Amino acid sequence: MSNSFEILMNQLGMPAEMRQAPALAQANIERVVVHKISKVWEFHFVFSNILPIEIFLELKKGLSEEFSKTGNKAVFEIKARSQEFSNQLLQSYYREAFSEGPCASQGFKSLYQNLQVRAEGNQLFIEGSEAIDKEHFKKNHLPNLAKQLEKFGFPTFNCQVEKNDVLTQEQEEAFHAENEQIVQAANEEALRAMEQLEQMAPPPAEEKPVFDFQAKKAAAKPKLDKAEITPMIEVTTEENRLVFEGVVFDVEQKVTRTGRVLINFKMTDYTSSFSMQKWVKNEEEAQKFDLIKKNSWLRVRGNVEMNNFTRDLTMNVQDLQEVVHYERKDLMPEGERRVEFHAHTNMSTMDALPEVEEIVATAAKWGHKAVAITDHGNVQSFPHGYKAAKKAGIQLIYGIEANIVEDRVPIVYNEVEMDLSEATYVVFDVETTGLSAIYNDLIQVAASKMYKGNVIAEFDEFINPGHPLSAFTTELTGITDDHVKNAKPLEQVLQEFQEFCKDTVLVAHNATFDVGFMNANYERHDLPKISQPVIDTLEFARNLYPEYKRHGLGPLTKRFGVALEHHHMANYDAEATGRLLFIFIKEVAEKHGVTDLARLNIDLISPDSYKKARIKHATIYVKNQVGLKNIFKLVSLSNTKYFEGVSRIPRTVLDAHREGLILGSACSEGEVFDVVVSQGVDAAVEVAKYYDFIEVMPPAIYAPLIAKEQVKDMEELQTIIKSLIEVGDRLGKPVLATGNVHYIEPEEEIYREIIVRSLGQGAMINRTIGHGEHAQPAPLPKAHFRTTNEMLDEFAFLGEELARKLVIENTNALAEIFEPVEVVKGDLYTPFIDKAEETVAELTYKKAFEIYGNPLPDIVDLRIEKELTSILGNGFAVIYLASQMLVQRSNERGYLVGSRGSVGSSFVATMIGITEVNPLSPHYVCGQCQYSEFITDGSYGSGFDMPHKDCPNCGHKLSKNGQDIPFETFLGFDGDKVPDIDLNFSGEDQPSAHLDVRDIFGEEYAFRAGTVGTVAAKTAYGFVKGYERDYGKFYRDAEVERLAQGAAGVKRTTGQHPGGIVVIPNYMDVYDFTPVQYPADDVTAEWQTTHFNFHDIDENVLKLDVLGHDDPTMIRKLQDLSGIDPNKIPMDDEGVMALFSGTDVLGVTPEQIGTPTGMLGIPEFGTNFVRGMVDETHPTTFAELLQLSGLSHGTDVWLGNAQDLIKQGIADLSTVIGCRDDIMVYLMHAGLEPKMAFTIMERVRKGLWLKISEEERNGYIEAMKANKVPEWYIESCGKIKYMFPKAHAAAYVMMALRVAYFKVHHPIYYYCAYFSIRAKAFDIKTMGAGLEAIKRRMEEISEKRKNNEASNVEIDLYTTLEIVNEMWERGFKFGKLDLYRSQATEFLIDGDTLIPPFVAMDGLGENVAKQLVRAREEGEFLSKTELRKRGGLSSTLVEKMDEMGILGNMPEDNQLSLFDELF
């Protein structure tokens, strides 16, 4: 202690024992700074160590008290020569840091002072809730905290927050508990105030006051059912004592460590949505709030506050009650309710919302006797609709809204023989006020009379429509009121134009519109309709230039350099069209030899002109079973042969398959509606003759046409509907009022809006109206499922009698003509293979005799007999034989095939070669004399674990096998369950195996199993946020979640099962079961798929799972490298089993490879999760490995179940429940009847143990207890949600052990195969740079993973580097890429070194790698330029190669390559 410091201690009166403390022995005052103006003395002390907190506080107190006596203030800073400290000392000083200075701010102090801290080097970790981890604190407060600790003598810290979920929850809980107390106190204060007011008031004249506290409390808090309800959308800030009413759409309960329960739920009133919170004391009290459940309607009261954790407004609920919500009902009497004939399900791609089950249930609830489904272009809702209708007891009418096209759209109308080069043409164009020749007006007719390409006369007249032109018309055409105000009368213009056109060929672009408009006006003025030839240059161009994507007038004139100054003014359009005509005439003569007008339709129209034809909608319905097959054929043809952008049905194709079908005229996109609007009733009558009934829809459905200015107003719309009715009446065809349903409830409209708008402005439905910032898509129609009374209201303008006829009478009458149909068959229809039963039996016994001798041991004979009885008796032999043929073919190509699923439970499958898993009891068998010995007492879980033994008969070493798996787990207890045989082919051989299926059964009977992809929850969330952005909306989080839920589940695309192939029996055809299509509408795909999701028909047809897997590919690669037959690798190799207990067998330590066992890169056991299980359980036998495999794949089998039992010492790895089959086997060994043991296994494996009735469950428990099954086993059963089949586990473990064998005994082969086949990401620079670089890169990625900053590629790379590190530690190396030795895709062994392939280089794909290898076989690369050219490499890749030293001294160019470039 220095003299100056000792003097200071005396002056401060510090206790003697403290002055003598070791901490102050070498104390010194470094300097003192006196601030005279502020009267602050600043001491700088130096101590040997950081002071104990008690001495520090005493020193601080002494200085403060002594200097305050003279009106001064003393502060001090400390330097410690040694900065060693304990976390306990740090914690003490951490709290002290908040006592004064900048850290003493109340907000910072209240959140941080009581938290736990720890130091690691210069990092100070503060453990706290999510609320404290804010940018504000990091930026403004944590640096001050570091400075304050530095003044106490600590090193300079970098302060970081370490989030703790438990603290987050506790802080939230404490906040709400305190908040509830404040609210309660406020209510009680209000009550006391009311009581005081009442006491001050004069008493009633005849009655004494009664003070009832509960009554006053009720008065202060109005009853919830009488409280005023606030719409959620009106609440944008914090408010107290609000009442909401709405439906719950999400609910979750959390139990805190203290036992309190937080009920989080979300509600919507369809104006917006809100998050709610309700805290209750414990789980028992939480049961009182079971009314908070999904889809329940509640009225809630509470305070709306900003939640500090979600950063969104949240209601803290004080009280709530269930309310009765009014549901829409069909109010018409029974027998007077409608039938909906036009309803879309969520299978209408990106267009409609309800599942077919919802439509059926709604119709049934409303008492409708039938309902029809009409999805766009597909029938994928049929199977689910079929089952739903049977369940609901309602008639379902099966339909489709199809896209009908004309097969051949004419180029020439009214054609005659005429030399194209000698004809005189009138090329004309009209401008109108709209698209309807009936409801809109001609405002300009212009034409150019042309001969041999020259204009010889012109016609151009405006016409006054008799009303001001709309802004839309003027904007589109450039024609103003001034243009037309002094124009000639329409009739005069028409007469003059007819005279102008005499003896000519008329020409127009999209002539059907112009000719239709002119004919309608001619007819209206009693003038003859057009009869001379008409050329449509739109169709002329489409057939002459099919390769062009666009054939509009604008794109064509631009392409051919024809001037078009004012598009949409008739005179300019006409002349431009004429110039194009003569280009086409010249082209068609030169390229196609067509010179005669009459030959254009014959010689030029393409067979696939339907691809460009205008689509018209029609509804097609299945009348009977013949119709069902025909609609399947139509859907198939439209989605395969005639698919172009969308599914299309050419009219002639529809005609050929029309038997058993009923046709409706569909919506505003149908041709009847179109012709009624554009050409009038007479023309529409001719078109409507094709249909069986006419559809009319509510005006609200057609209303978007008004917004698009295609229809003038609602009055005109009603006139169009009346015209449609007239069409039906004139033809004697029924007219039906249909609803074009796209969702069930009116409030669901927003979900469809979000889905449709997500398609973007390129979609026709989203084409904008208006311009610039005012451009918006037309509104969508109100397309909810309407009740009868709602439909009658929509058609009230027709009068009650007519409305009832359309809505009720006609729909019910038409429903009567539809017959019941069988959409999904009730039986399994397996394909036919000649002598399948005999072959399966023959193959089975042949192999069994070969292994077990003849006669067979009883246990083998009985098992075969039992299985064959089920297999052959239920028609499953063909399934077994087909699988056997596929496996045999792959084996012959040199690949092993692994089984998956429970097929290994079948001994017949083992004998005929479908699976290598032997399901018999553990047993020995002699390969020399067929002696066998079976162990049936359960003492061994696997035959591979039995000790080695020699044959007592011949002394030959016995082989060991048998996994003890009952057959019942494959085909059910009665052996009649359809077998699901899944096979793992090598990924390399899978395409060949698929083609084998076609070869065996025929191309017309084998199809890939189809799938339907719907909008996922995350995608729907993206759609909502996109809608928010694009349409200027703002939704709180709860509303976004609600909207995303509503938008999810809509069909988005189709696909195919990765390996599933559906086989149709050759005595039927595919249309007996399903239509077909291409996956994702890819008409270039090699395979067609089932149109139905394969799950919908999997009980009717055979599905073969021909899957691709890496394991067989690995085994094949290892066999090729080593020459070792994988079938001869033992399953009980000591070295292999040693991998599961340590790393010694690899010659490395756990520290070297970062894991305590040798599991890295071993299939099934190499993941972090399973490696952790291995570390905990230390398996030593094959049976225990099976257990691990089952435990790792099951749900709630390991975590919270077997893991706890093993940790607590109640059971071990061999006795816990691992695989589903173990339950049946264990219970039978315990003494239960096989049937009951099987049933218990089925209940447990499907997670049904706690869902079955208490009576049933108790029966099983009593039986188990009676047979001394331990209590822990029974409890374990109750926790399981899903279990893995033992046969699947056995097949996977056998493959894994083969791979592991090479890792132990032939490591260089193993690493070569692993990196060639399994590794997903490479960093060849790091991989070849040695251990230090590898470990450093792993550490970098590991750090990123901790902070959730690692990319998927980096995560994959980390897995690769783990194996790379292990390989280097074992003494092997990676070489550099070698331009002349590296392979395209596979690693190359060079002694103890692996040379990487070209695909391991970042950015170099497989195709380029193969091209590079082919190029080098042609000769050496003489320059980088040649390498780029011949090798197909980009400049960037060549530069990378050069940087990596792969190219050596290769020059940039050479004389030869320069010569090649020049010539």
Curated annotation (Swiss-Prot):
Q: Which GO terms describe its molecular function?
A: 3'-5' exonuclease activity; DNA binding; DNA-directed DNA polymerase activity
> For this protein, what is the EC number?
2.7.7.7
Q: What biological-process GO terms show up in the record?
A: DNA-templated DNA replication
The superkingdom of the source organism is Bacteria
Annotated Exonuclease domain ranges read: 425-581
Similarity field: Belongs to the DNA polymerase type-C family. PolC subfamily.
Q: What is this protein called?
A: DNA polymerase III PolC-type
Instruction: Write the gene name.
Output: polC
